[in-house]
Amino acid sequence: MPCHSSAAKAKCLADIMIDTHTHIYEPEFDQDRDDVVKRAVEAGVDKFLLPCINQESIPGMKALAQRYPQYCHTMTGLHPEDVHADWQDVLDSMWDKVENPVAVGEVGLDFYWDDTFRKEQIDAFEYQICKSVDMDLPLVIHMRNAEPQLLDAMERHKADGLRGIFHCFGGSRESARRMMRYEGFVFGIGGVVTFRNSRLAQTLSDAVPLDRIVLETDAPYLAPVPHRGHRNEPSFLPFVAAKLAQIYNVGIAEIDNITTSTAQRLFSI
């Protein structure tokens, strides 16, 4: 693979990667979506997993998966910030619109900006946990300012053999150790690990083994250094892999091989 771009240079000694969480179906990519996919593939990203946010996400996700069936896989679910009093009707209307989802996500609890619908968020999350069990699919979990409530909900279903990802993990060592108790779950690590003021590198080194990590971008959000502050995209994933290689003192190829194997096993792709 010729190493023309900075991302490709970071990737030259590495193997195939999977972006387990990317929103490249969103309007931020309308002007250059095909180029975004091309750059990512050239950088070594072999799969793009597309989390569902709400009903409006579905047409774009489906169109992208139909255009790039060899690369793109869709999820189904309702993001906690989109949970309102009518959450049950919303989920009932959208559930069967995503064909062959690889996960239930992006779901969870978020009390950061507004907890008006706190009870509804918890009810919707538990409903979607049950759906994931019924469908034998992993969960992709979003959590912000809600760790005790979210882990309480998961504990009520622990006997169901839950599995999935704690998406965009950026918590403390104590949080990581609590989440490590859920043996079917791994940690989604993205651009935040490259930020100079982030303590995530030390947390991972202290508390999370490499085989419990998968790569993600959360594009268009949270671009890694050296692209911080700009639109994120999957071709930047090598910068995350390179940082993890430093943290775990292994080669980039080993990071890619282990995280890819973990993602393939979790999502059956």
Where do the model's predicted regions map?
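Mid-domain alpha/beta scaffold segments of enzyme catalytic cores
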Residues: P2-I269
